[in-house]
Amino acid sequence: MIPPKYQPIWDKAKEKLKQGRPDDLTHAEKVMKTILEYKGNLPIDQDILIPVAIMHDIGHCMILPEYFKYISGGGKLKNGKLAHMLIGAKIAKDILQEVGYDEEKSKEIIEIIALHDADQLEEKRPEFYNTENKRIFHDFDCLDRYNKERIDAYLKAGLFKTKEEMLKILTEKVDDLFIEEIKTQVKKQLKEL
């Protein structure tokens, strides 16, 4: 499933992802698969977006599980996601250097990871999502939230009190998506939930 050129990144990231939130590893796999299988008209730069998909939530491995409720779910604090983004950027930088990944591409990968959930920082949102790769990744990352497995994982982990609470929040977030094609897909998935 993983193209060989990204396998060293995956191998180094996998154990750290397992130490994060309960579904971080599965989420990384799903976002990566969505990017690899995408057949639409968006310009997909796999050399940037696949490493980002693998490592974007890797910073959760440094957050104690009892504090996940402050970064995900109904009890999420405003700007609560900032810690995992900045920690994740450092971990990603180390992994990319260890595997000898292209330096220029690494810079962009690290920058996307450092602010991939910047929609939590609402006043800075336009400034943070200033490249096509950032906007594309944001929407592909969000796309995985709109499925039964992810909702069940969040409910099981206690990140939301009820399915209705989670669906309400997800419905409100549709307008945060940048790409009409993804918005349409998300709206369809919401109707099926």
Q: Language-model features: where?
A:
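Divalent metal-dependent phosphate-bond-processing catalytic cores, especially two-metal-ion Mg2+/Mn2+ enzymes
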Residues: P4-K5, K18-D47, M55, P65-E66, ...
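Active-site alpha-helix of zinc metalloproteases
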Residues: I48-V52, I112
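Catalytic glutamate of the conserved HExxH
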Residues: D57, C61
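Metal-dependent catalytic cores of enzymes that make or break cyclic nucleotides
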Residues: M62-G80, E123
